[in-house]
Amino acid sequence: MQIRLKPDYSFFIASSSTMASTSSLGPSTLLSYGSPSRQFPDFGFRLISGHESVRIPSFRRFRVHCESKEKEVKPSSPFLESSSFSGDAALRSSEWKAVPDIWRSSAEKYGDRVALVDPYHDPPLKLTYKQLEQEILDFAEGLRVLGVKADEKIALFADNSCRWLVSDQGIMATGAVNVVRGSRSSVEELLQIYRHSESVAIVVDNPEFFNRIAESFTSKASLRFLILLWGEKSSLVTQGMQIPVYSYAEIINQGQESRAKLSASNDTRSYRNQFIDSDDTAAIMYTSGTTGNPKGVMLTHRNLLHQIKHLSKYVPAQAGDKFLSMLPSWHAYERASEYFIFTCGVEQMYTSIRYLKDDLKRYQPNYIVSVPLVYETLYSGIQKQISASSAGRKFLALTLIKVSMAYMEMKRIYEGMCLTKEQKPPMYIVAFVDWLWARVIAALLWPLHMLAKKLIYKKIHSSIGISKAGISGGGSLPIHVDKFFEAIGVILQNGYGLTETSPVVCARTLSCNVLGSAGHPMHGTEFKIVDPETNNVLPPGSKGIIKVRGPQVMKGYYKNPSTTKQVLNESGWFNTGDTGWIAPHHSKGRSRHCGGVIVLEGRAKDTIVLSTGENVEPLEIEEAAMRSRVIEQIVVIGQDRRRLGAIIIPNKEEAQRVDPETSKETLKSLVYQELRKWTSECSFQVGPVLIVDDPFTIDNGLMTPTMKIRRDMVVAKYKEEIDQLYS
């Protein structure tokens, strides 16, 4: 099955593997849904089979966002040709040709509004949109004075801060390419990225970080210069180092002086000596877990601008909204989010896991952009607070939450927002009775749900903020977490994408927030589900490999054409390596507004094949097990074994609360009981369990920067213990 967003505002589903004109369809069938309205009109649809066309009565459904394709762009003068020098008015979004063009528009619209709050650096900083634009201009000009040229690679190895954003955009504004990574990566990985990318210089967080990598980099890499974003140059270990070192302030001052001279001479020609094309590479982002075969994802300005221009459909941010940022700024998900929100005039605050709880209460953000693990942590924290209450309060809270979840379930049924794989819609009378029953039950539960909002949920909201929406990406959002936050009135919007797709390819909107799904395709984005063996396109509701095509798909892997060809074909289809399905379209029933949404099942490479030949998706079991407060982390194992096993990190604090006399043996027994309890309804059950003490973290290399567990590395670390477990 294939979904395609067409320029005539139509939404197509085709049964063939490639789209064809209606005059050449032959036996294939095409469904066309069309209306230019921006609300939720009655969509008529036309069945076209061969050369015949039949009009079928319209039915009510939600609109799928479809707009005309982006026009081809010509090479443009770079960002440094800004109104600051030429006196031009602010650029319209249609005129953006390179990512840094957005700052010219934002500075003009939101000049004195606060753009960034960076409270945990020394000194703490707060920048307005105008100040941010000027610092980017100064940094870019400072690099130009140092001799940085278009297409040269500059490594940016640093973590979240306002200076990270300034340097990131300053590098892009010169026409150079930034190569990004965080400071928590290993020295070996950073050196490999630097050398493979052919970077010529490096921008780092602070002296402590560079001192850690100095020996390897000075002896094995060629560095034209080094820039420190924070800290003093005097703290650097410079023995035997013959590299020019600049502080952030020196680059900014250098840029200011050069700009002042050019402004005084009325000569802007120096700012126009490079041209940035939309198809030029803007950044190279290396995929997590890079080892022997580097995969540097080349993202162009056009790739990133696609995200910036079209994410507003999913996140209708307004000037003055507060965003809390905690993911690595260099990661594709956070990066695209930041670029987008700064075109809306929002105020972004940087935080971290360490300060998240306090900052949610302190800043009361309208939005938070994060990964599923963070929402799971918030969920667990709320549950823990409820459990610590008196018996009466605990009973009342848990009862009302169950009532609210039942109410929302009924609401989803009568609104037609329940997922199904069934291709055949229900009979009209069955659909009507189902709808009527759900309306009646919802009406009965509504008073108790409103009571819960007043007595319980209001307090939860005051402690976490998130008054508009929590944006989730970078992994699968567990359905129990999804349902819980829906019940208490905190909207979670899930999306899906990869580094190779800049990253978002689909997402849930406020108007069509189908739980359990990743939403509809983004503007200009095509999806198809193919059989992993035959590569044939599968019909709606059938599980297979997800392939996507669109303007956000990468140019390719840097200096790695063979790997690029494995995932990206000549027609532009990118193999995501993920499994999933596309929800069928129904004109009636509880799934009538779910048609076309994407549902993820997991990574194809994560599928466990037992020695019996059975295929198991571990994610289903892991998500179910994580509902237990006794289980902190879990990895399901069993490749080529007769049965499944699991590696589990227990929550010892919670276990001791359940049983204060917990010993090693009783802990294992308790964990196993909890595992059986919460996974009893899963398709497969877990057999032997390995209890380990050390948690999986980013620092020990067992989690990615977006907090996903690296299964292969966990299995490799505990190989001997796993062998003993099965012996």
Curated annotation (Swiss-Prot):
GO biological process entries: fatty acid biosynthetic process; fatty acid elongation
Main localization of the protein described in the UniProt heading: plastid
Transit peptide: 1-66
Source species, domain of life: Eukaryota
UniProt subcellular location: Plastid, Chloroplast
Recorded GO MF terms: long-chain fatty acid [acyl-carrier-protein] ligase activity
EC number: 6.2.1.20
Keywords: Chloroplast, Fatty acid metabolism, Ligase, Lipid metabolism, Plastid, Transit peptide
Any one GO cellular component localisation term in the record: chloroplast
Catalytic reactions of this protein: a long-chain fatty acid + holo-[ACP] + ATP = a long-chain fatty acyl-[ACP] + AMP + diphosphate
Alphabetized PANTHER family for the sequence: ACYL-ACTIVATING ENZYME 16, CHLOROPLASTIC-RELATED, LONG-CHAIN-FATTY-ACID--[ACYL-CARRIER-PROTEIN] LIGASE AEE15, CHLOROPLASTIC
Family indicated by similarity: Belongs to the ATP-dependent AMP-binding enzyme family.
Function: Probably involved in the activation of fatty acids to acyl-carrier-protein prior to fatty acid elongation in plastids. Acts on medium- to long-chain fatty acids.
Name used for this protein in its record: Long-chain-fatty-acid--[acyl-carrier-protein] ligase AEE15, chloroplastic
Source organism of this protein record: Arabidopsis thaliana
Organism placement in taxonomy: Eukaryota, Viridiplantae, Streptophyta, Embryophyta, Tracheophyta
